[in-house]
């Protein structure tokens, strides 16, 4: 795993203390994956250059584990939106790949606002989660890339004992994980 790699196109997998998966951040490293910086960093957990990768073309980060700017990435097209996200499945502002609902109507994925949140000890800026149904608190408030997945047309999940916190709006997370269906 690359230093401070991300999964989910922008959600950091870095833990606190500079641990990135099983690797500790080294003095220098080069991240070249789609959702990573493309330049060699003086400290892989403290990049200071403007990111130009395909998934983070205009992001400026003070820490690879702590993005501070709103993303305009190909993988997170709704992140410029910090408020006014849609509040219902398929109501305006939706983006492709809909599903056929129980009534037979096509229901598109919809943008949902995600407030400032804590992710593995680091902060993420306000963003939107693309979902067909209202995302869970786990997804909105504790959206750890290693634990949670966004809701794709109603299919949401959390890996057990990993996502939800005592202050979570929802009392428990799903005990098992499920795969997106669309």
From Swiss-Prot:
**What are the ranges of the sequence repeats?**
27-36, 37-46, 47-56, 57-66, 67-76, 77-86
Q: Which UniProt keywords apply?
A: Keratin, Repeat
Superkingdom field? Eukaryota
Q: Name one GO cellular component term.
A: keratin filament
Kindly name one Pfam family recorded for this protein: Keratin_B2
Residue ranges for the region (6 X 10 AA tandem repeats) are 27-86
Function comment: The keratin products of mammalian epidermal derivatives such as wool and hair consist of microfibrils embedded in a rigid matrix of other proteins. The matrix proteins include the high-sulfur and high-tyrosine keratins, having molecular weights of 6-20 kDa, whereas the microfibrils contain the larger, low-sulfur keratins (40-56 kDa).
**What is the protein named?**
Keratin, high-sulfur matrix protein, B2D
- What is the source species? Ovis aries
């Amino acid at each position: 795993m690359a230093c401070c790699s991300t999964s989910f196109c922008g959600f950091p997998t870095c833990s606190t203390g500079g641990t990135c998966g099983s690797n500790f951040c080294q003095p220098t490293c080069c991240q070249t994956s789609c959702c990573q910086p493309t330049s060699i960093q003086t400290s892989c957990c403290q990049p200071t250059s403007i990111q130009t990768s395909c998934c983070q073309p205009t992001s400026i980060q003070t820490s690879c584990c702590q993005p501070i700017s709103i993303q305009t990435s190909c993988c997170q097209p709704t992140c410029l939106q910090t408020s006014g996200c849609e509040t219902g499945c398929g109501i305006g502002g939706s983006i492709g790949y809909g599903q056929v609902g129980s009534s037979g109507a096509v229901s598109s994925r919809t943008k949902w606002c995600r407030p400032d949140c804590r992710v593995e000890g680091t902060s993420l800026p306000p963003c939107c989660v693309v979902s067909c149904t209202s995302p869970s608190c786990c997804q909105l408030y504790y959206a750890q890339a290693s634990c949670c997945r966004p809701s794709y047309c109603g299919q949401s999940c959390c890996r057990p004992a990993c996502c939800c916190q005592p202050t979570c709006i929802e009392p428990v997370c799903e005990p098992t994980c499920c795969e997106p269906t669309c």
